Design a protein with these regions (language model features):
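Divalent metal-binding segments
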Residues: 28-36, 41, 45-300, 316, ...
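Bacterial Sec-dependent signal peptides at the C-terminal "C-region" and cleavage site
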Residues: 15-31
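Acidic (Asp/Glu)-rich catalytic clusters
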Residues: 271-274, 304-309, 393, 415-416
Length: 571
C-alpha cells in the first residue's frame, strides 16, 4: 500500500504541475504523454478496456492500468487526466472523395436542403457571388434529387434562376446532374443527341427534349468540361477543407476512392510542406475512364501515380465500376425495374472484368469495386472468385463498396472469398431516394432487402465503414447510429428499413477502426491501441457505451491525435 500511496502522490504532483502550466503547454515540448483515468477502448483482439495509456515519440508504449504507467512518468512527461472520458482509436474512412468534395465546398453547396424553395434561395445567392461573376458559371453539388418525381428534376428549375448563366449541379448521389437550358445549349445536347456511353440523357417522353437531368459522368461531363477548370490552388484548398473536416470527426485515414495525377500531386505538395495530417490510401479508376480499355495507357498513369507515394500517401489500389446507381436505372439488377423492364448494365462484360481483376490481383494490387445492384455484386464476387482460382490466396484485401442490393445466395460468398464489404451505413434508412424513387422502381420487397449489413456480418463477412463523402456526411457517428437503428438519425424522416439488419455498436466501431485500417493495409501500425502502434487516438465527449443508440449521432470528438500530435481539439 505504501508504494501505491507514494506513486499516487508523485502522480498528483505531475497533475498539479500540468494544470498550473495549462496555458503554456503548447510551448512546452514533451517526449512522453501519459493519459490517465480514462475509459480507454483499445479495440485489440480482446477488446480490452483500460484506464491509462502512454505515448512516446508518437508511438504507444504502454497500455493498461494506471500503475503500469506511473513508473514511466518523469519531468519529460505531460500527464493528461481524462476524467473518465472515452478514448479510442481514431477512425478510418474506407471510401471517400476528399479532394473532389473539398473543392465542391468552394462552389455552390446545396447539401442538406430538403425543399425547392431553399434550393432556389441558395442558387440565387450563388448567382450573385464573386465566383459566378468571375467565372460566368454556377457549378454546384449536393442536390437531393430524391425530392423530385422519379429523381428527374427539370431544367426549368434552374432556368428560373438564370437563362443566361450556365448552371450545372451534381446531385448528392454523385451519379446524376442537373443542367439549365444555357448549359445544355453550350454542350450541344438536344433532342437529336445520342446517349453517351454508360450514361443517360433524361428526356421529355412526348418531345424527346432533354429534361436537364443527366446520369453518370459521361453525360454530366459533356457540360462540366465546358466550365472553368479547377486550379492547383483549388486542389490545395479542397484538401485543406477535407482534412480539417476529417479531423473534426476523428478521422485520421481515408481511402480516396478515385484519384488522378492532380489529386496525387496535391497530396504530395501537402506532404512536402509537412501539412498532410492524414494517411491516404488511393485508388486509380479502371474500366470507365477515357483510358478504360487501354491497358498500356492505364499502366502509364498508374506508374506516374506511384511516383507520388510518400510516408502517408500510397497508391496500390484499382477502382472498378461494375454498374451505376438505381436512381438512373444504371444499377445492374438480377430482376427488372418494374416501370421499364430494364435490368441496368454491367460496365465491363464478364470475361473482361474477370481477367482485369485476376491480372491486378496477380500484381498484388487491391481491387476496390463499386457495385450497387445485385447483378453487379454477383459479377464482382464472380471476378474475385476467378482471380482466386487463377492466383491462389494473396493478401490484397479486395473489397466491394455500396452493396445496396445483394442476392441472398451471394451473402455467404464474402466470407468464403475473403472479400470485405464496405458499406455506406448512413444510407441504410428510408430516405427520399428509397421512398420516392426505389420503391416505385423495384418494389417494397426488394427495398426491404437493401443494405444487408447484419446478414453479411452474421455469415462471417468483414464489415468496413466508409462515408462516400459528400454523398453523405463524413461523420462516422451518423453512419454508426443509422446501422444500429436503420432509421433517420435526425428524426426528419419516418420509418425503419428492415430492422433485422440492425448492427451492434462494437461491430460498427470495429468497421471504422481496425477493419478499415486492415483494408488500407495499415492494421499493423494503426486501427487499435496497442504497444508499438502509432498513437492515432480520439477523445469523445460521451462514452458510446453509456448512451442509447439514438444519442450516438450527437456525440462529438473533443480531440483528434495522429502519431501523438493533436490535429483537432475543442477547447
Amino acid at each position: 500500500m505504501k508504494e501505491i500511496n507514494i506513486r499516487c502522490l508523485v502522480l498528483s504532483t505531475f497533475i498539479v504541475s500540468c494544470l498550473f502550466f495549462e496555458n503554456t503547454l503548447s510551448k512546452i515540448s514533451f517526449s512522453k504523454v501519459a493519459y490517465i483515468n480514462g475509459s480507454i477502448h483499445t479495440f485489440n483482439q480482446d477488446l480490452s478496456i483500460v484506464d491509462s495509456l502512454l505515448v512516446e515519440d508518437g508511438l504507444i508504449t504502454k497500455v493498461g492500468p494506471r500503475d503500469l504507467i506511473i513508473d514511466e512518468i518523469d519531468e519529460d512527461t505531460q500527464v493528461i487526466d481524462l476524467n473518465g472520458k472515452m478514448m479510442m482509436p481514431s477512425f478510418h474512412d474506407a471510401h471517400s472523395h476528399p479532394i473532389w468534395d473539398g473543392i465542391n465546398q468552394l462552389k455552390c453547396v446545396l447539401t442538406d436542403l430538403y425543399d425547392l424553395q431553399s434550393i432556389k434561395d441558395v442558387l440565387r445567392d450563388c448567382l450573385e457571388s464573386e465566383l459566378t461573376k468571375s467565372t460566368g458559371w454556377i457549378v454546384g453539388s449536393g442536390l437531393n434529387i430524391g425530392l423530385f418525381p422519379s429523381g428527374n428534376p427539370n431544367k426549368s428549375i434552374l432556368d428560373d434562376i438564370s437563362k443566361d448563366i450556365p448552371i450545372i449541379l451534381w446531385a448528392n448521389d454523385g451519379h446524376s446532374g442537373l443542367a439549365n437550358s444555357k448549359a445544355l445549349e453550350l454542350a450541344n445536347i438536344t433532342s437529336d443527341t445520342k446517349e453517351p456511353l454508360y450514361g443517360v440523357i433524361e428526356r421529355d417522353l412526348m418531345t424527346g427534349e432533354p429534361s436537364g437531368t443527366l446520369r453518370e459522368s459521361s453525360a454530366i461531363n459533356a457540360v462540366l468540361d465546358l466550365a472553368p477548370k479547377d486550379t492547383d490552388v483549388d486542389y490545395d484548398k479542397g484538401l485543406s477543407i477535407a482534412q480539417d473536416m476529417a479531423h473534426s470527426f476523428g478521422i485520421t485515414s481515408v481511402l480516396e476512392a478515385a484519384v488522378g495525377e492532380r489529386h496525387m500531386a496535391a497530396y504530395k505538395r501537402a506532404a512536402e510542406r509537412e501539412e498532410l495530417e492524414l494517411r491516404v490510401f488511393t485508388c486509380l479508376e479502371y474500366g470507365k475512364t477515357s483510358f478504360a480499355h487501354d491497358a498500356s495507357t492505364f499502366e502509364d498513369v498508374y506508374q506516374r501515380l506511384e511516383q507520388f507515394n510518400h510516408e502517408r500517401l500510397n497508391v496500390n489500389c484499382v477502382k472498378i465500376f461494375i454498374d451505376g446507381v438505381l436512381e438512373g436505372q444504371t444499377g445492374a439488377l438480377l430482376e427488372p425495374y418494374l416501370d421499364s423492364g430494364n435490368i441496368g448494365e454491367l460496365i465491363l462484360e464478364k470475361d473482361s472484368l474477370n481477367k482485369a481483376v485476376a491480372r491486378f490481383d496477380s500484381e498484388n494490387r487491391q481491387v476496390h469495386t463499386h457495385a450497387i445492384g445485385d447483378r453487379a455484386v454477383r459479377a464482382a464476387l464472380d471476378a474475385y472468385e476467378y482471380a482466386l482460382k487463377e492466383n491462389g490466396t494473396l493478401d490484397n484485401r479486395h473489397h466491394i463498396s455500396h452493396l445496396q442490393m445483394i442476392s441472398k445466395v451471394d451473402i455467404p460468398r464474402f466470407s468464403e472469398l475473403n472479400v470485405a464489404a464496405t458499406f455506406q451505413a448512413a444510407w441504410a434508412m428510408p430516405d427520399e431516394y428509397i421512398t420516392g424513387i426505389n420503391i416505385p422502381e423495384i418494389g417494397i420487397e426488394r427495398v426491404n432487402r437493401m443494405y444487408p449489413i447484419h446478414s453479411v456480418f452474421q455469415s462471417g463477412g468483414l464489415i468496413v465503414g466508409g462515408s462516400d463523402w459528400a454523398v453523405t456526411t463524413m461523420n462516422p457517428f451518423i453512419a454508426i447510429e443509422t446501422a444500429m437503428r436503420r432509421e433517420d438519425p435526425d428524426g426528419r424522416l419516418k420509418g425503419i428499413l428492415n430492422p433485422d439488419e440492425r448492427m451492434g455498436l462494437t461491430e460498427m466501431l470495429k468497421a471504422y477502426t481496425i477493419n478499415a485500417a486492415y483494408i488500407m493495409h495499415q492494421d499493423h501500425i494503426t486501427g487499435s491501441l496497442e504497444v508499438g502502434k502509432f498513437a492515432d487516438l480520439i477523445i469523445l465527449d460521451k462514452n458510446l457505451y453509456d448512451i442509447t443508440p439514438n444519442e450516438i449521432s450527437e456525440v462529438r470528438v473533443l480531440e483528434t491525435i495522429i502519431e501523438g500530435t493533436t490535429v483537432f481539439k475543442i477547447e
